[in-house]
Amino acid sequence: MRVALLGGTGNLGKGLALRLATLGHEIVVGSRREEKAEAKAAEYRRIAGDASITGMKNEDAAEACDIAVLTIPWEHAIDTARDLKNILREKIVVSPLVPVSRGAKGFTYSSERSAAEIVAEVLESEKVVSALHTIPAARFANLDEKFDWDVPVCGDDDESKKVVMSLISEIDGLRPLDAGPLSNSRLVESLTPLILNIMRFNGMGELGIKFL
């Protein structure tokens, strides 16, 4: 499967690129600047070895993929989705986006509606799937890291959700869990500021989640 990581130059994009590429998937790292995407793709290839990882501008990456993952900072994500609307409308689009604000008392969820629902509205698409919000990105980007985390997944299109859950399940240590329709995304996204607050107030490192 060809997976585009739009804005895939951060830790979540790096982790997905390395782990999915070593499983045999074709990875396209997207960025607003092609040279940055190509440089990151070359960096990832050096780590992953004989793997298919290329770099392109976001527009070209979106055009080339079967699945697009919005590994973009929240503040730029909606503009990017709007710019790529005509390309992404018919694609499966994964949203790990979380609107988070940091204040004196900690982290808060900063949106009336879920990021995933906003993306779906912008794209006019039912194929948006909400997932990967609670992945500790720096740990995930380290191939030596061993983990056992659950990944809640929300979506309205059952087939798109099944494809994304199947892809996630290929990564050793991740268990996708169906968390219902896209309207539940706000519940899942709000786990991220909760985790960040637990880390902050307890002096803990990056945390994932596991339902027992």
From Swiss-Prot:
One GO cellular component term noted in the UniProt record for this chain: plasma membrane
Family matches, as Pfam families: F420_oxidored
Binding of NADP(+), residues: 9-12, 31-32, 36, 72, 76, 98, 137
Family the UniProt entry places it in: Belongs to the F420-dependent NADP reductase family.
TM regions (residue ranges): none
S-S bonds: none
Protein name as catalogued: F420-dependent NADP reductase
GO biological process: copper ion import; NADPH regeneration
Swiss-Prot/TrEMBL catalytic activity: reduced coenzyme F420-(gamma-L-Glu)(n) + NADP(+) = oxidized coenzyme F420-(gamma-L-Glu)(n) + NADPH + 2 H(+)
Assembly with partners or alone: Homodimer.
Alphabetical list of PANTHER family matching this protein: DUDULIN-RELATED (PTHR14239), F420-DEPENDENT NADP REDUCTASE (PTHR14239:SF0)
Alphabetized UniProt keyword annotations: NADP, Nucleotide-binding, Oxidoreductase
Gene3D superfamilies: NAD(P)-binding Rossmann-like Domain
Gene Ontology molecular function: any one: NADP binding
Amino acids binding coenzyme F420-(gamma-Glu)n: 207
Enzyme nomenclature, EC number: 1.5.1.40
Superkingdom of origin organism: Archaea
Temperature dependency: Optimum temperature is 80 degrees Celsius. Is highly thermostable.
Taxonomic placement: Archaea, Methanobacteriati, Methanobacteriota, Archaeoglobi, Archaeoglobales
Keyword Cell membrane: no
pH dependence: Optimum pH is 8.0 for NADP reduction with F420H(2). Optimum pH is 5.5 for F420 reduction with NADPH.
Its biological purpose: Catalyzes the reversible reduction of NADP(+) by F420H(2). In this reaction the proS hydrogen at C5 of F420 is transferred into the proS position at C4 of NADPH.
